[in-house]
UniProtKB/Swiss-Prot annotation:
Record field: catalytic activity: [[Fe-S] cluster scaffold protein carrying a second [4Fe-4S](2+) cluster] + N(6)-octanoyl-L-lysyl-[protein] + 2 oxidized [2Fe-2S]-[ferredoxin] + 2 S-adenosyl-L-methionine + 4 H(+) = [[Fe-S] cluster scaffold protein] + N(6)-[(R)-dihydrolipoyl]-L-lysyl-[protein] + 4 Fe(3+) + 2 hydrogen sulfide + 2 5'-deoxyadenosine + 2 L-methionine + 2 reduced [2Fe-2S]-[ferredoxin]
Binding site for [4Fe-4S] cluster 1: C57, C62, C68, S296
The protein, known as: Lipoyl synthase
EC number(s) on file: 2.8.1.8
Residue runs in coiled coils: none
Claim: 4Fe-4S is one of the keywords in the record: yes
Domain Radical SAM core: 69-285
Organism: Xanthobacter autotrophicus (strain ATCC BAA-1158 / Py2)
Sequence similarity: Belongs to the radical SAM superfamily. Lipoyl synthase family.
Main location: cytoplasm
Cofactor: [4Fe-4S] cluster
Molecular functions (GO terms): 4 iron, 4 sulfur cluster binding; lipoate synthase activity; metal ion binding
Length: 317
C-alpha cells in the first residue's frame, strides 16, 4: 500500500520531525505479503470511501490489507484519523483531532451491512480531548451495528481511557462480543515505545472488563522485535492470565518510517511458535503468534475458535 500525504500542508507526525532517522533493517524472507488490488479489495475500498470512513488497515499501514480487503474484511477506525497520543511505533496521524462526526455510528452500521460481515472489528484513535475518551461514541457505534446487521458479532479494540472515570463502564454496557485492548509491549519498553500509556492501567482495564461482564471475551496483543527479552514476554503472559484475558496475539513490529522506533530484530517463525506453545500452556483460550499476526487479522475465524474453546473448557459459549 502507498499512502500519499501532503506533508507541507499537514505533517502526519509533527512530534517526530526532529527525531534522528533510525536504521531500517532489511525484512527477512518470511515477511512477504500480497499486494492489494483484487476485485474484493476494490469493492471494500469503494464502500469505505462512499461512507466517508477511516480504517486502521490504511491509517496504520497494516501489511495484511491486501488479504483482508480481498475478503471484504476491514477494521473500522472511528472518531477521526488523528490521535492525541504520539506512540513511537504507530503510523496513525497525531495532532489535535476534529469534532466527532455524530453520524459516524450509523455510517459504520450501514457499511457493515453492505459488506455482509459476520464479524467486525471497531477500533479508534485515542481521544484524550474528550471528557469520556469517546466511550459513548463506541457504545453508539455498537448499537448501530446491532440494528443494521443483527447477525454480526462485534469486536472492539479500544484506547486505555486513561483518567476517564466511568468510560469503561459505558463501553462494557453496550456488550461487545470481544473487548480488545493491546498492551503493545513489555513494561520496560513503555517509556520509549508507548510513553502516554501506563502498563498496569491497561492491565487493570482488561481485568475490570471481566469483573463488569464475565461473558465478554477479552483479548490483548503485543509486538515483538522492539528489544524486549523472552522472560519479559513470558511475564507479560502471566500478567494477562492474572487479569483473566482469554486471547493473546503476538506479532512482529514493523517500522513505519525512519522516524519511528527502530526494529531491533526480526523474531523467527520458530520463536513465534514457541511463544504460542507457552501461551496455551499458561491457559489462554486462543493464541495467535506469527510474524504477520495483527490484532484484527483473521478476527472472524479466530472468534469462532475462541467461542468453541470456551465451550470445550467451560461448557458454555
Amino acid at each position: 500500500m502507498v499512502t500519499v500525504i501532503d506533508t507541507l500542508a499537514r505533517p502526519r507526525h509533527p512530534e517526530k520531525a526532529n527525531r534522528p532517522e533510525t536504521e531500517v533493517l532489511r525484512k527477512p524472507d518470511w515477511i512477504r505479503v500480497k499486494a492489494p488490488g483484487s476485485a474484493g479489495w476494490s469493492q471494500t475500498a469503494e464502500i469505505v470511501r462512499a461512507n466517508g470512513l477511516h480504517t486502521v488497515c490504511e491509517e496504520a499501514g497494516c501489511p495484511n490489507i491486501g488479504e483482508c480487503w480481498e475478503k471484504k474484511h476491514a477494521t473500522f477506525m472511528i472518531m477521526g484519523d488523528t490521535c492525541t497520543r504520539a506512540c513511537a511505533f504507530c503510523n496513525v496521524r497525531t495532532g489535535m483531532p476534529e469534532a466527532l462526526d455524530q453520524g459516524e455510528p450509523q455510517k459504520v452500521g450501514d457499511a457493515v451491512a453492505k459488506l455482509g460481515l459476520s464479524h467486525v472489528v471497531i477500533t479508534s484513535v485515542d481521544r484524550d480531548d474528550l471528557a469520556d475518551g469517546g466511550a459513548e461514541h463506541f457504545a453508539r457505534t455498537i448499537a448501530a451495528i446491532r440494528k443494521a446487521s443483527p447477525g454480526t458479532t462485534i469486536e472492539i479494540l479500544t484506547p486505555d481511557f486513561l483518567r476517564k472515570d466511568g468510560a469503561l463502564e459505558v463501553v462494557v454496557a453496550a456488550r461487545p462480543d470481544v473487548f480488545n485492548h493491546n498492551l503493545e509491549t513489555v513494561p520496560a519498553k513503555y517509556l520509549s515505545v508507548r510513553p502516554g500509556a501506563r502498563y498496569f492501567h491497561s492491565l487493570r482495564l482488561l481485568q475490570k472488563v471481566k469483573e463488569l461482564d464475565g461473558s465478554i471475551f477479552t483479548k490483548s496483543g503485543i509486538m515483538v522485535g522492539l528489544g524486549e527479552e523472552r522472560p519479559e514476554v513470558l511475564q507479560l503472559m502471566d500478567d494477562l492470565r492474572s487479569a483473566e484475558v482469554d486471547f493473546i496475539t503476538i506479532g512482529q513490529y514493523l517500522q513505519p518510517t525512519r522516524k519511528h522506533h527502530k526494529v531491533e530484530r526480526f523474531v523467527t517463525p520458530d520463536e513465534f511458535k514457541a511463544y504460542e506453545t507457552v501461551a496455551y500452556a499458561k491457559g489462554f483460550l486462543m493464541v495467535s503468534a506469527s510474524p504477520l499476526t495483527r490484532s484484527s487479522h483473521h478476527a472472524g475465524d479466530d472468534f469462532e475458535k475462541l467461542r468453541a474453546a470456551r465451550v470445550a473448557r467451560l461448557g458454555r459459549s
